[in-house]
Amino acid sequence: MSIVRIATFILSVFIVGMVEMMVAGIMNLMSHDLNVSEAVIGQLVTMYALTFAICGPILVKLTNRFAVRPVLLWTLFTFIIGNGIIAIAPNFTILVIGRILSSAAASLIIVKVLALTAMLTKPKNRGKMIGVVYTGFSGANVFGVPIGTMIGDWVGWRFTFLFIMAVSVLVGILMIIYLPKESELAHAN
C-alpha cells in the first residue's frame, strides 16, 4: 500500500476517534449554549459509543453486498452531514440526531477502512498494518481532543464540528483519489 493511502486511512480513523471523545473537552461550552447540564452533554459520549456498537455490525451486514468504494464515500458523506447537524443544532434534541447519524456512519467507516487495510496488505504484514492504521484512533485521543478543545475555546464549540467537517472533506477527496477500484480489490491478497 502506498504511503498516501495509509495516511488517508489513518486520517479517516483519526476523525472518527476525535468526534467520539472531543465532547469531553467542550462539554461546558455546549452545556452553556444549549441550556442543558454538563451531565446531559456527557451522555453524548455514551450515545456515540452505544450507537457505534449497535450500528456497526448491522451496517456492515447491510452493505457487504455493495462495492466498498461507494459505500465508504457515501458513509463519509453521511458522517459529514451528521456533524453538520451537530454544528447548527438549535437544541439538544437536534444535536442528538446529528450525533446518532455521525456515530452510525463512523462505525461503518472504521470497519470498512480496517477491512480494506487487511485486504490490501500481504498476509504476513496484515496485523502490523492494521495496527498502523489504528494509530489514528489513538492519535485522536492524544491530539484530537486537545485540538477540539482549543478550537472550542478560541471560536466556539460549533467550530470544532466544522473543523471535523473540513477534515472529513479532505479525507473524502483523498479517498476519491486513493481508494482502490474493484479491479484492484479483485487482485488483492
In which residue ranges do the predicted regions lie?
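Small-residue-rich segments within alpha-helical transmembrane domains of MFS-like 12-TM solute carriers
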Residues: 17, 21, 103-111, 142
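Conserved MFS/SLC helix-loop-helix module at the cytosolic interface between two early adjacent transmembrane helices
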Residues: 54-93
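Flexible cytoplasmic inter-helical loops of multi-pass small-molecule transporters
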Residues: 177-189
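Extracytoplasmic
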Residues: 5-38, 56-59
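Helix-loop-helix hairpin linking two adjacent transmembrane segments in secondary transporters
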Residues: 94, 132-177
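Residue-level signature of mid-helix packing/kink "hotspots" within the transmembrane helices
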Residues: 21, 49-57, 141-142
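Cytoplasmic helix-loop-helix junction between adjacent transmembrane helices
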Residues: 98-136
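MFS-fold secondary transporters
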Residues: 82-87, 102, 118, 175
